Amino acid sequence: MLILTRRPGESLHLGDHIKITVLGVQGKQIKIGLEVPDDMQVYREEVYLRVLEQNRQALCAMDSDVLAAAKLWPKKTNE
């Protein structure tokens, strides 16, 4: 993990298209600004982890739905 020290108003760049700026610090909270391309999704970690879990659950449900649907079709016999 790269660890950097920045003061309010200072920024850092990730590649050519992402800029992170420290906007302010109050106690234990840091306010940051992100400049990212419009097509890039940005999530807070707790939201991102929740989305991943919901996607995982949806895939598991879809797998069981596919298996249930497959049981509805008669098995082919070799003729």
Curated annotation (Swiss-Prot):
A Gene Ontology BP annotation from the UniProt entry: bacterial-type flagellum organization
Domain of life, source organism: Bacteria
Principal subcellular localisation of the protein: cytoplasm
Gene Ontology CC: one annotated term: cytosol
Localization of this protein: Cytoplasm
InterPro entries: CsrA, CsrA_sf
MF (Gene Ontology): mRNA 5'-UTR binding
Keyword terms: Bacterial flagellum biogenesis, Cytoplasm, Repressor, RNA-binding, Translation regulation
Subunit structure and binding partners: Homodimer; the beta-strands of each monomer intercalate to form a hydrophobic core, while the alpha-helices form wings that extend away from the core.
Matching PANTHER family: CARBON STORAGE REGULATOR
Role played: A translational regulator that binds mRNA to regulate translation initiation and/or mRNA stability. Usually binds in the 5'-UTR at or near the Shine-Dalgarno sequence preventing ribosome-binding, thus repressing translation. Its main target seems to be the major flagellin gene, while its function is anatagonized by FliW.
Protein family (similarity comment): Belongs to the CsrA/RsmA family.
Protein name: Translational regulator CsrA
Species name: Solidesulfovibrio magneticus (strain ATCC 700980 / DSM 13731 / RS-1) (Desulfovibrio magneticus)
Gene label: csrA
